[in-house]
Amino acid sequence: MVNMEDNYRRGTVFIQGEPAGIIEETDEGYRFTYDPEYCEKEGAVAASLTLPLRTRSYFSEVLFPFFDGLIPEGWLLHMTQEIWKLDRRDRFGVLLSACRDCIGDVSIIKEE
């Protein structure tokens, strides 16, 4: 039997260079889950004030505003979409492609 969750696009979320969780696209929207081991680490910090540390998953019908805010804007967004041939309406695809090396503490690496 095929696990449908294996077909979801997802990325590992890194905070200050440490793997901290997974963001994924689901049939209902988006899910973000912190890694339980990360949550237990002394000094672990949340990705955002709107996504405090917890082991239960967060769900949203639209891309979480914090993650959407990591996506480049203006000419850089246009260049990203042109170079990687991304659909401009696919915000999650842009997030997974362009946010590997963001300014700040959070980055996302697409899982293959």
Model segments located where?
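Phosphate/dinucleotide-binding and metal-coordinating scaffold of catalytic cores
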Residues: 1-112
